[in-house]
Amino acid sequence: MSPQPVTTALAEALAAIHAAAFAPDEVWSATVISLHIGLPGGFGFMDPRGGMILARTIVDEAEILTLAVLPEARHQGLGRDLLRAAMRKAAKTDARAMFLEVAEDNIAARRLYASQGFTEVGRRKRYYANGDDALVMRAALTPPGEDVAR
């Protein structure tokens, strides 16, 4: 199974995945998810095994807005597959770099991002509601026609 593009019609299902994957103070509602998908340049993917990713492109840059995998579906490559799908989609829209924020203590996510070419380029102090810092990471995107898989 591979990640499939999402539409606002899937917002409730995406919100359920997000709610199961994140702490209550970090959960996005179906309304917020719909708004992000509907933004100019907004897009996302859902994996039927229990994962979702939302991103957006602006001119020649892309940003991962959120990536969530159900706890029972982790360590099966879903996060990697979703991230690769978003990187490919962004590259097809002429984005040449992708950015994201990740909690400094989220070691599993940081390893995933590093495995796909992301490197730390900054820090947002006290970014999260609990006061934790976010690391800003960046990856160069592969031009269309070339494979981003690592």
What is the predicted role of each segment?
Residues L83, D105-A109, R126-G131:
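Short glycine/proline-centered loop/turn elements that form peptide/ligand docking sites
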Residues A90-E101, R124:
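Conserved GNAT acetyl-CoA-binding A-motif
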Residues A97, A103, D133, R138-A140, ...:
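Conserved catalytic core of the tyrosine transesterase superfamily
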